[in-house]
């Protein structure tokens, strides 16, 4: 079954059982191919996510003159050209749906000697980019956006960049990463501070590639002029993808699943803390480290959940997992309150509105507010859901269908392939009632 089908029909299946291997982490895969391309020497990447977003990033570096081999779907061998070895592209660089790819590439391309244009699909073309282009402009970059600050990004090369001390107004790992990557090319030191700590994939991986970088929660700094050394990277399983099965096993009676070698970056796992507040039964085992990233097996067993107030401090550490959390909240006894999550309105869709509207269509009472919502737990009924082409909305309602009193039709599911190719077949094998329709 292909994720490119038009819609899914989700309905009650069986309890989830057994051991599951989740595809590689999207955030780590993006950075691995990017940093390997900028390194001196050849790097091997194992566990690479073969999704549309990550393929877009790899294809862009091929357009920039980097040779990338594909021995298997989950492997890449990248022949790095060094920080100063990228070549002018022959046309626009298409990021597809990948906000990570576009924002991080803006930081790299701002320092090149040539001009370039970054474009994206209809969803990415609506997303805010001034949060990246403004600090890059402070460093001396010249990047043009549309009048409303959206893509395409027209990057003018040949600019001399200066290091800056940047206090980011938003808690965004993508913004931080773009500034740090530009900082590699800048004169002097570049430092970034954040209102709340965000994921530190960039900092950890730059360190793995030999860059001297100082970082702690909410702070990072590096000096310009450094080079990257090739290294091999083992990409852990993607926590954001695992999140859908973590929630499903938590709310489907009788479930007991183990998810293998899941990335547990401490700035990524807010969902685990939130679900544990709600009474979830989640046990970590076999802790290890892959490419600077902590990993572990997660055993998740069904447990009756109760509503909870989600601490705002957890929000940056679970920003991509809120669609799954909303489904857990709908299945819980009592009310779950989410605040401080306005960033959800500028993701691949307005996720607050999309989840609130979808849950209401299934009979759940949701009080929406500008930066969050209160979800009143209840019984999930039948309905038709518009995913708005957002992969995480689509997968969240595939879970909701597992507790539905009838069927849930989830429309516009093609973009699931951007982050989780094979989601539907893996879900079916685990026990989901899920079928594809044209």
From Swiss-Prot:
E.C. code: 2.5.1.19
GO cellular component, one term: cytoplasm
Reactions it catalyzes: 3-phosphoshikimate + phosphoenolpyruvate = 5-O-(1-carboxyvinyl)-3-phosphoshikimate + phosphate
Annotated pathway: Metabolic intermediate biosynthesis; chorismate biosynthesis; chorismate from D-erythrose 4-phosphate and phosphoenolpyruvate: step 6/7
An individual GO BP term: chorismate biosynthetic process
One GO molecular-function entry: 3-phosphoshikimate 1-carboxyvinyltransferase activity
TM regions (residue ranges): none
Subcellular compartments: Cytoplasm
Record-annotated active site: 320
Signal peptide span: none
Alphabetized UniProt keyword annotations: Amino-acid biosynthesis, Aromatic amino acid biosynthesis, Cytoplasm, Transferase
CDD domains: EPSP_synthase (cd01556)
Residues where 3-phosphoshikimate binds: 26-27, 31, 172, 174, 320, 347
Binding annotation for phosphoenolpyruvate: 26, 99, 127, 174, 351, 392
Job of this protein: Catalyzes the transfer of the enolpyruvyl moiety of phosphoenolpyruvate (PEP) to the 5-hydroxyl of shikimate-3-phosphate (S3P) to produce enolpyruvyl shikimate-3-phosphate and inorganic phosphate.
Family of the protein in this entry: Belongs to the EPSP synthase family.
Subunit structure: Monomer.
Name this protein carries in UniProt: 3-phosphoshikimate 1-carboxyvinyltransferase
Taxon lineage: Bacteria, Pseudomonadati, Pseudomonadota, Gammaproteobacteria, Lysobacterales
Gene: aroA
């Amino acid at each position: 079954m292909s994720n490119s089908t038009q819609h899914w029909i989700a309905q009650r299946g069986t309890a989830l059982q057994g051991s599951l291997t989740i595809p590689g982490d999207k955030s780590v895969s993006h950075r691995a191919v990017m940093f390997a391309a900028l390194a001196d020497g050849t790097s091997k990447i194992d566990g690479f996510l073969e999704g549309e977003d990550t393929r877009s990033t790899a294809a862009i570096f091929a357009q920039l003159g980097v040779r990338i081999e594909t021995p298997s779907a989950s492997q890449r061998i990248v022949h790095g050209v060094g920080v100063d070895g990228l070549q002018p592209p022959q046309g626009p660089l298409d990021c597809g749906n990948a906000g990570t790819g576009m924002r991080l590439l803006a930081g790299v391309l701002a320092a090149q000697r040539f001009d370039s244009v970054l474009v994206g699909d209809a969803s990415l073309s609506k997303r805010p980019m001034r949060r990246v282009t403004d600090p890059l402009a402070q460093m001396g970059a010249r990047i043009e956006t549309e009048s409303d600050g959206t893509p395409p990004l027209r990057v003018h090369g040949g600019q001399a960049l200066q290091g800056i001390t940047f206090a980011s107004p938003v808690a965004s790992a993508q913004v931080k990463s773009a500034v740090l990557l530009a900082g590699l090319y800048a004169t002097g030191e570049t430092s970034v501070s954040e209102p709340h700590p965000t994921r530190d994939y960039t900092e950890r991986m730059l360190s793995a590639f030999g860059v001297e970088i100082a970082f702690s929660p909410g702070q990072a700094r590096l000096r310009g002029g450094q080079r990257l050394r090739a290294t091999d990277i083992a990409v852990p399983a993607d926590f954001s993808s695992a999140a859908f099965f973590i929630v499903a096993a938590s709310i489907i009676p009788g479930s007991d699943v183990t998810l293998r070698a899941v990335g547990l970056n401490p700035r990524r796992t807010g969902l685990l803390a939130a679900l544990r507040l709600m009474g979830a039964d989640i046990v970590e085992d076999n802790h290890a480290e892959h490419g600077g990233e902590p990993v572990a097996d997660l055993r998740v067993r069904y447990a009756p959940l109760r509503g909870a107030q989600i601490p705002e401090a957890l929000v940056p550490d679970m920003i991509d997992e809120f669609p799954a959390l909303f489904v857990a909240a709908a299945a819980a006894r009592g009310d779950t309150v989410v605040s401080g999550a306005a960033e959800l309105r500028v993701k691949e869709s307005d996720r607050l509105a999309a989840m609130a509207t979808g849950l209401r269509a299934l009979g759940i009472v949701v009080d929406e507010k500008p930066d969050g919502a209160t979800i009143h737990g209840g019984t999930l009924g039948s309905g038709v859901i518009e995913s708005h082409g957002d992969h995480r909305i689509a997968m969240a309602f595939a879970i909701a269908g597992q507790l539905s009193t009838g069927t849930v039709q989830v429309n516009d599911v093609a973009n699931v392939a951007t982050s989780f190719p094979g989601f539907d077949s893996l879900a079916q094998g685990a026990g989901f009632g899920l079928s594809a329709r044209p």
